[in-house]
Structures are given as structure tokens and as C-alpha cells.
Amino acid sequence: MNYFKYFIFVVFLFFTIVKCEQLLGEIEISNKNFAIDASVVDTKINYILDDTIKTPKLIITSIKGDATNINDIITVSEDKSTVTFGDFTELSSSNKLVGFNWISMLIASLLSIGLFATTTTTNKKSSIIILIIGFICLSLMINGIQSISLSDVSVKIEIRVPSNYQFESFKLKLNSGSSNIVGLIANSIEIDSCSMVKDHSITIGQLVVFSSLKVCSSLDIKITNLGLSPSNTIAELKTTRNIDLQFSNGFSGSISIDSPSVTLDPGCTTTISGQTTTGTCNGGSSSKLSISAGNSAIVRNLEITCPIDNSWRVTPASSGPSTNSPSIFTTQPATNFNYGKSNLVFMAQWNNVSLLDGPVENSFNITYVTWSPNSHWLVSKDPSPTLKSGVNYEFSLELLLGQPLGEYTSISNVSIYFFNPKDITNPNGNSRYFQYSNKPPLYMKTFSGANFISNSNFIKTSITFSPTKDIGSAVFALQINRTAALTGPSEISISIKDMKITIPSKSITTPSNILSKDSELLTLPRPSTLLDPQDSSSCTYKQTDLVHWHNPSTWASGFVPLPSSNIILPEGKRVLISPCSISQTEVYKKITIPPTSELVFSDSPMTINVQDIYVQGKLTMGTNTCRYNANINVIFHGNKTTTDTIAQYFGSKGIAVASGGFISVQGKQYHNTWTKLSTTAWTGDYVIYVQDSINWEVGQQVLITTSVYRDESDNQNEVMTIAAIQGKVIQFTKPLRYYHYGGQEYQAEVALLSRRIVFRGDGNGQEQTDSQSFGGHVLVNGEGQFSGIQLIRMGQTNIKARYPLHYHLAGTVKNSYISDCSVTNSYYRCYTIHGTNNVSLVRNVAFDIRGHCYYLEDGVEVDNNIWFNFASYVHPIGKPAGGPSQTGEIFQQSDSLTQPADSAAGCYYITNAYNSLVGNAASGGWSGFAFPNLDKPIGNHRTISIIPSQFPLKEFTGNTAHSSGYYFEEGGSIYVGGNLTFNEATQLLTYNSGRFSRSTYFNGTKKDGNERWMRFNNTKIYLSNRGIQHWGERVEVVGLESHDSIRPSTLFGQAWLSNAIVNGQSGNIVSNQGRNRQGFQFYDTYVQTILSNINFRNFIKDPDSENPESDNRVIISMTHSDVFKPQGISATKQITLTNVASSQVIGHRVVETGSSRYFNFIDWDTSLVPGRTAVGAPTLVGSHQNWWQYDATCSYNNDWLCWVCDKGDKEIASISVLVPGLIESGYTNQEEDSYVGTASLFGNGITNRRSTNITRNAGITGVSNMGWYLWFSTGTPTSINIWVAQVIKNNYLFVAIPYPANTEFSIRCAYRWNNKFNYNFVLANSASEVRNGNGTRYYFDQTHLFIKAVNLALTGNEYFERGGAKVYNVFWEFNIYIEASNKNVQPVNGFYTGIPDTLPSGNL
């Protein structure tokens, strides 16, 4: 125990002595003849280019030893040419202090040990001896601390120099350690690590030597990218080990190599004598290379591949494919879909069993606990392959019993099932309880036999099955049934191997159902079929005034700049880069192109690794008439930073083009860049057929988009590689995993992702770039032309202005475009227009994008052309925006969500609608096309005095969107809504994804006569939630095809939908997952909606629907509210129905709300409600209440739960009866059952009650030119205000209200906005006189007050008309005020109570 205590004290003493790394000091290098003599110390030397300094310097840090001050171990010569490490006996004051501290610590520690020993040891004599020995040791240490032993010292030396700094001479004399020297430039260099016979590893890169290079080491010597002056340079390398030397651009001179193993690249003529190799390289010169290597010598890149003659050009790349396509194969091989532990889950009625690895490859094991159920399921977590009816498929597995066959191990049979996903427990959910509905499976088959009996060998069992109908979206399950009721008292197991479904091989023949057009109704615009004309004589790289990058004379320094330096092109020169000009592996730190300079790339395959390129002048890598055919890779390097390393405000890791600069990067044109299937592609297919001519190539990557609704949670987009291509037929290297629809209704898009010119971030899915989501970026503040580029892993997540391709604050440009490019796997957006106008984005594609893709940033961007582009698989950043009903969800700007609208990331994000969008397609995303509301510009344009949301669409024609809108209940594939604001106080953006309305005007200027409609022309929507979701005041949708969407559109304000096909169910077998489809839902208040010339088709009854609104109906009522009540706001005309049963035409849900009671619309030509006697005449449809049964033409439809009547001379009328303290104006949100009376029809021969309830929420809607009897259960109010909201010109309401006898009245009409329409009612002689009058008289028959409600302020032009149908305006603030008084009857709290509910005469 005592020894353990001593040990603890020794450990304590050790840790008090050990020191950490310590900076000793810095030394400025002012002499270009510089040497370091470190022959007596261990050194770790790093040569670093540092452009933050102007004068070279040494930074010396102690790693080990006693030194704490640079002067203790270093002397510097007076001329500062030599730094020498030495062993000095006189210490600096600081080291003396350290010595004193050490002594003090040692005394304290030894005294503690002595004290400890004397108090814990019974042998006092031995304790005293211990203490004496300690003091002797202390005395020796005190004597020794007067000097430092440099053999125990290790230092780190950083030699920091500015880029392109050149030494006259540079010498290192080294002891043990290591040196990493990159970017050293000198006339002569000498590195000696041999003299001290110590091991010092040496790595050298990017070395430039003009006169002499000498390197000697006892370890390996490795030098990469060595540049020697072409004449009079001597290089001597010596080691007892190995030498690996690589020249940057060859070597010209004599060589002498002494080594038992020599490897030389081509370029030299040599002779060998013993182990000595001598000769000349590249014609020889006065330069000499001498190598002595004890083991081996390797010399690379000896040949001079880059001549410096200005007329020399590398051979340009060919425009032809790198590989000629083989023929499309005639027989497609069979395809297996394998199942195993990773994609199956055990499910049963009880017990939770995990699948474990099996005994052999491709096998898994199931161990049943005691008394498990006799039946269980193996359910696939992946969608099943789609299966064609009538095709023979094979299911097979190999099974091994874990125990001998017995009572509890016997398997009676196995069944395969295909279930509708909604009918069973979700295999990807948390529950393992297998439950399915009473609906039959899509398909099942049982098989049994003797192959389930072996516990010694796997025995294969297979069955052939042939579905009787096509199976689309399905879950595959395998049911295993045992003979015994339970598994018994002991655990048992089985193993399954090679479980799979096999799709048989088939012959490849041209299908008979190839499409000749992509739409039935619409003509979607397509780009020109012509390729851009090319003229090879115009190629910039052929021009004669170019100078070569690799020619030392190009550079003022006389040498080719090193990759690790900040490279600035010489002013006024046009510099040509060829593949041999640059290192293909080293990372170039920064290249700057001054305003008068140009950097031109050759049209030849090359790779340039770079951190930053700053273009103040011009960068040319192809032009519009000379598009490059070479495979050129530009790889951007760098870890995440917010420091501006390119230039101020321009970020890091990319290309920035300054104002006044110009960039042109234009690769081979592939056309079309995207197309569509011309027939459906099935699971297992290798071959697809497309609609358009294409010039794609073998080896390129192709995307086929999803044909399902939710592409984010069920990603069925597939990236394939072309194996063969002939015309419009493409064969892939592997079979398709999913089904991709290509019917007449719509077709999956097929997009080319590959390009010959590639910009990419340096990550590969595993490196730091990917984990930091920090790729490269291209920013253009001047003019820029880009075509034929693929950008991979570009963009920098949540860093503003760091996007793959980005026009940044360039104003109105004259000649800028991005054409036929591809952005894939982007960390932040795809194509951005920011503070820039007149840009063209044409024929581009994008796939797998984080945040908004095509992105117009601040709300000031106008007059841009966005034509024929494609975007797919776009991901919201963070939590996707959801929220209840119309309110949406609010997101605040944060470090993890710099642009809060990225919570609703769309394929196209348009902050100012005054741009041209033609022929684009959007697959996936929160929405396909997003038009957020901005009351002010944001970002750099907050002071611009416009209202972006007031600008109408400049052009929106022929665009397509699908597989989107599902994150939010009210989300749409085209979403005009949401609100983005900037808070001046917090300096943060806020985004609300919900309902925000916009009103649009000419030039964005609000004034009378400037009103403009948001117009969507020839639009196709499919697999969508709301299709077009428009929250605004004015919208026209003309030309629409909607297929397999929950609802084709939700349109607010004055809205017209015309010339459309609305298809509830297409032929896509993976789209029908039991979702409710609605043709159109009429809104419940204050809008004007007209539907005209629409074909509704394939709305099929759902026997399991909960109510009519969820039963695949064509027209749906909105019935959720008593606060919001419809006026006469909806109309239809020229409606046709195809494959729609009569029961499915209208879906009206009967609930006790005003919106349910007052549901109505006008069918202006009886086309939607056929079977009327007055064929072609207008028909009025009203809700379930007989309040709408106004004449003998009315009939009740039991399927629709609505009254249908000939309209005749009637119109929809609406008033608000306002009573102080009972029914107030506005949205008072009273309860739905807050009944205060009834409104009943009277007159016109009506004698029975045809009524509707009045609640405390204002508003009654019914039929005009009828008698409306208003009765209040609380008693008749003494004061009533009737707002005549919608009684159109030449129409009226004959209103009756009961009062006690002898009541007197003061009745007046007032129009808030023009008092010339104000008047007082006068007493008439009869009720009929009132009804037949002009609306200025009243009559009281001692039971009922009669007035005629008309609106004399109307001109007759108060309506919205489109497509031959009208919807009349709501007219604001035209009111009739009734004041009643009675000398005989006193009101109670303003009400005359106890008044009988007596219906006026039916003869009135």
C-alpha cells in the first residue's frame, strides 16, 4: 500500500514537469540568401505560402525540451542570412525563472514525499534516508539546470513566404525530424540531412530551381512537380534509400543515375552499365541531373509534352461519342428482386421477432420464441415490383429447418400476397402487429410440398404465378404457416436463402402504343430541334495572340507559377491553358484574371483542381459558336468558411466574375436535354422509348422521374447509365427498379444528367465537403454565358449567394444566359438570378437539389426568360412547412435556415411574377412553381420602392408540374401564396407558408384601371395535391390538364378555369392508392369562380368514403364553417362528363353550418346537371334545405343532397341582417348552433315552410325575386340593418318581418360611398304595392312589415364574366336601416317578444 502512495506522488511530479507546445518567437527573413543550420536539434519544418504577409518570416515553436525563448537556442547572423541552432550555457532570464520554478516545485514535491514517508512508515530511519536521497537528487538537478541540452529539444519551424517569393539561395542543414516543402522558388537550393547521420524525412512539391538543387537524405526523397530552368541547372539527389522524382513539364539535359533499380518515363535516350544509367533527355542541354539511390530511383514526366512555341496547340477533342453504341439487344434478360434481412420485416398477431444473419451468404434466420403463433408474415419494406397481368413470374426461396422435422417445426404451406398499401399495417412503421382490412389482396397464391422438411441442407422451392390484373402500388408479403397451433415450449428457428421474385426475360420489339403527342388537349411548347450552329474557325484557342501558361516567359517572374501560390495572370495578356500546362492533381490556390487579361482553355481533356478563380477580365472555355467537345473537369476545393478568399463579398471555393468581367463556359450541346417516355416502362425493363430525337451517348447518366405522388418519402426517381442508344430507343446497363408511366395522359420525364464539362465540389459522399454541405459555387457580377456544363455537389448550404450558378447583382445584362446545363446533388439551389434582369435560362436540368432550385431571389428580378427547363427531386431545408388548414406555418431566419422560405423549397421560386416561364417541367419539391408574396423587396434591394407581389405574370405557358404539394393541406404544385417579410428591427427574414392574397396590376402599380389577372396558359398538372393553389384577387387558368390529382386547382378572387381536362384517374397503375379525387371545390365566401369548357372524367364511386366530399365527386361544396357563408359566387358552363356516374357529379356534405345551408351555383347551360326539361337553359343548384325549393321546376337529388331548379328569372341573392347585440357585422365567430331565427320563402303560391336557420353569424343567401320572411326567436328587434350585399340590378327581395300591431317605422336607405343614393322609405297602401314598387316604400299590415330590398346604386355592370357565364359582385355598404317603435308594447332589451311565427300569405 505504501509503494502505491509513492507511485501516486511520482505521477504527480511527472505531470507537473511535462510542458505543452510553446511559441518561442518569430524571425523576419530579409536576406534572399538564407540558411538554417538545425544540425543539433530535431526539427519539423513546413514551408508555407502565406499571402497575408509581404516579407518572409520564421515562426519557431517548442515541441519538446526546456527552451522558452527563441534566444536560448538560436543565433541569427548580422545580415540575417543564417539562423543557427546552438547549445548555450547562459540561460535567458525567462529560462532561469523556469529553472527556479522547477526547483521550487521539486523541493515542494520531495518534501511532501519525505513528510509522507515519515508519517506513514514505522521505520523512521528509513524515512530519513529517503529524504536525504531526495535532496541529493535535487542538488544534482539544480546544478544541471544551468544549461539546455539541445539533444532533448524538438522544434517546429514554419517558413512563411508570400506567393512567388524567390530566394537567391536556400540551405537547410538538418538533424532528425521531417520537412514538408511546397512552393519553394530559388536559384539554388541545398538540403542536407546526411551529415549528421540522422533520419530526417523529406517531402518536396512544386519546386522551382534556376541554378542548383542538392538534396541529401538517409531516408526516402520524394519530389513532385519539379521545375528546373531549361539550361545550366544542376540537380543532385542522394540517399541510401529510394528516390521518387516527378517533373512538372519534362527535363532537358543529361542524366546520371546510380541505383540498382531505375524506372524512367519516356523522353530520354539512355545506356546502362551495371547499376549506372546515363543519357540525355529531350535533345539534351547544359542542365544535369545526378541521382544516387541505394534502393530504387523513379523519375516521372521526363518528356516535354507542352512545347512553348506560340503556334503550338494541343489536338482538340472530337465531337463524336467516346464509345460507339452497340445495337439494342433483342432479348432482355430475366431480373431478380431479392429479399433478405435488410428489406423484410417479421410481422404477426403477437410476438416481435428480429431477422438475423443466416448461416450462409444471402440468407437470414428467424428464431421463434416459445408459444409463438402458428402463422406469421415476412413483409417487404420496399415497394413490390409492378407486375403485368398474364405474365408468368417466379417466386423462389431455399429453406432450412433449424431443428429436425417434428410436431412444432412442420410447415404446412407458404403463401405469397400482394396487398394494397392502405389495407395492411405499414411495414416501415413502428408496429409489428400484422393487420389487414377485410378487402381481398390484390393477388395471392399458396404452395406447399416436401421441400420444407430438411434441417441439413437448404432445399429450393419455386412457384410460377400469373396475376389476373396489373399490379401497381403494392406491398409484397410472404405468409408462413406451420402445422401446429403454436411453436411449442422450446425456441425453434428456420433459415431462408435466396428469396426472390424473378421477372422473366422477354423479346425486345417496338411497342405498338408509341405516343405521337404528349397531351390530349394541350399543345405544350418545345424548343427548336436545331443545334446551335458551330464554326471551328471562331474558336478562341486558335487565335494567334495567345501565350502559353506553361511558358516561363509568359510570367514576369520568369517561371511558371506554383499551384500553391496566388496566381495573377500578367496584365494585357491572353493566356492559354492546355492539359500539359497544369498539374492535374495539385490544388491551385487562387487564379486572378486582371481586367485587361483573358484566360483561355484548350478544347482538350483536362482536370484542374482549384480553390478560387477571380475573373476581372475574361475567362473562356468555349463560345456559342465553338462549344468544346473535351471532357474538362474543374474541381473546387476547400473546407467550410465564411471568409471571402476570392474577393470581398464573393466568398470562397468557386469562380467569381467581377462587374465588368466576362465568362464563357460552353461544352458540347446535347439536345434535347430532357424528353418524355413515349410508352410506359415497367419494373425490370432495360429498354425505354422516348418522344424526342436525342444525341445522347453511351456511358452517360440519365434520370427517369417518379410516377408516384410523394417523391420525397417514396423516391422512385432512377438514375441510369446508357448501355446502348439508337434513335429514340435507350438501353440501360441495369434494369429499372420502378414503374414509370408513359400513357396519353402524362409521361415520366427522361433527363440527361451528364455533360462533357463538369464543375464539381471536391466531396465524394464521404469527404468533409459533403458532411459540411460546402461545395463550389459560380457567381457572376458581370456578364456570363454557360452552356453544356454539369455541376455536381455545388452550392453551400445556408450561405447566401453561394449557389451553383448565380447571376449576382448584375443589373440589366445584355448577353447572359445559362443553356442546356445540368445541376445534380446540389447543396444549395441550382440556378439563381439575383438583382439581375434579362437573363435567359433555357433547356437546363436539375436533380437532387437542396433548397429552392431555379431561384429569383429578392423580388426585383424581372424580364428574365425561363424556358424549357426541368427540375426534380427538390428538398426543403429542415422541417417542411405544414400547418393546419389555410394558416400554414411560420419559419424564422436562423443559421440552419438562412432563407426561411426554403422550408417550402420549390423547383421554381419566383419572387416577382413579371418574368417569362415557358415549357418548363417540375417534378417533386414542396411545390413545383412557387410564387411567394413579398410586400417589399428583400436582401440587397430592401430600399427599392416596389411591391413585388403586385406584378402579374409576364408569361406562363406550357408548364408542367407533378408529384408535389403534399406537405401542406393546402399546398399546390403551382403555389401562389405564402409570405416572406424582413423585420427591420431584428434584421431577420420570416416566412409564413399559409394563405396570403395578392392583387396584381400593370407594372405593379395599384390604381383603378391597372388591374391585371395572373394568367396560367396551357398548364399540365398530375399526381398533385391542389394542382394550382392560387390565393389572390384575380386569376385565369386557360388550358389545363389535370390527372390523378386530389384537386386540379383552388382559385381565389375573380377566378376563371376554362378549356380543361380534369381526370380523376389515369391509366397509371401506381397512382391509384385510394386517395380522394375532387373535380373542383367551390369556395364558401366572397370570391367569383367560373368553370367553363371542362371535361371531367373518371370520377369513380368509393364505397368506403366517409361522406360525399370524400367520394371522388366532380363538384364539391365547402361546408366547414358557419362564419363564412357563400353568396352567389360560383358558375359553370359547357361542362362534359366522361365515365362519371350521375351520383358522382356533386358532393355536398350536410352539416349544420351556414356554408352547408347556402351552398349553391349556377349551371348556365345545364351541361353539368343534365336531364332538365329546359335543355340548355340556366339551372340553379342549391343545398339540401327546401329553402332552395322556390318553384315547381325544383327537384331534390338524393345522390347530391341538393335541390336543382330551372333558374328562370331568379338569381342568387345575399343579405346580412344585422341586429345590435345579436348579429354583428364582420367575422364574430359565433357557434354554429347559435340559432336566433329562421328565414322562410313566402308568396308565389307557397303555403308550406321552406326555411333556413338564422344564426348569430351574419349572412343569408337564397334566391332573388322571392318573398323572404324573417322571424327571430328572441323577438323582433327594434333596430335592424339589412346590408344588401348581393341583389343584382332589376332584382329584389320582398322582405317580411313580424311586429306587434300599431308599430311605427322609420326606414331609410344609405350608401356609404355616394349619398345621392340615400333615401327614406315612405308608407305604401298595400303589400302588393311594395312588391311592385321601386324599393322606396314599405307597408305594415299590423302583423308583418313589408319592404322591397333593391340596390338603386347599381349600374348593371357589377359582375365578373368569362366563357359565357356570369357571377355577380358583392356590393359593399348599401344598407337599409329599420327603426321600430310602439306606444302600446314595450320592447325587452330592444326586442318585441312573444310575436307569433306566422308565414305571410302565399298569394302575395
Swiss-Prot record:
Glycosylation sites: N352, N365, N413, N481, N639, N838, N979, N1003, N1017, N1253, N1334
Domain annotation G8: ranges: 553-679
Record family assignment: Belongs to the comF family.
Signal peptide: 1-20
Protein name: G8 domain-containing protein DDB_G0286897
Listed Pfam families: CEMIP_beta-hel, G8
Membrane topology: Multi-pass membrane protein
InterPro entries, per the entry: CEMIP_beta-hel_dom, G8_domain, G8_domain-comF-like
Subcellular localization(s) per the UniProt record: Membrane
Keyword Transcription regulation found: no
Superkingdom of the source species: Eukaryota
UniProt KW keywords: Glycoprotein, Membrane, Signal, Transmembrane, Transmembrane helix
Chain segments annotated as transmembrane: 97-117, 128-148
Glycoprotein among keywords: yes
Cellular-component GO terms for this entry: membrane
